[in-house]
Amino acid sequence: MEFHIQKNINSKEPVLINFKTNDCNPCQMMSPTLQQVKNAIGNRVLVYNLDINKAPNLAEQCQISALPMMVLFFEGQVVWQTKAVLSKEEIIKNVLEHTQ
């Protein structure tokens, strides 16, 4: 999984990753919201809800310092990130704003 995601990050397609753990309550709150984002704009951006324990190298590479943490990649570069718990609308707005 980690290799697959890394490959997508380096492509031209936008990639949104929500870094989480299963025992993080705010992370769990974000899961349904992230699914709504995926349903709304999944044809324009790859969306992953990723447990850092299953992708420790990627989490380290992205310098994940708090959870949940969302990181948006576009053309291989980090173009936006947040540690905030956001609404579907706020996430979509930021994704579209940073990938146009």
Which role fits each region the language model picked out?
Residues 1-14:
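A short beta-strand-turn-helix
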Residues 12-13, 20-23, 66:
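Short pre-active-site segment immediately N-terminal to redox-active cysteine/selenocysteine motifs
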Residues 16-17, 47, 70:
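Hydrophobic beta-strand anchors of alpha/beta hydrolase catalytic cores
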Residues 28-40:
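Typically the conserved alpha-helix immediately C-terminal to a functionally engaged Cys/Sec
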Residues 52-59:
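Structural microenvironment flanking redox-active thiols in thiol-disulfide oxidoreductases
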Residues 62-71:
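Structural micro-motif
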Residues 72-100:
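Non-catalytic, surface beta->alpha helical segment in thiol-disulfide oxidoreductase systems
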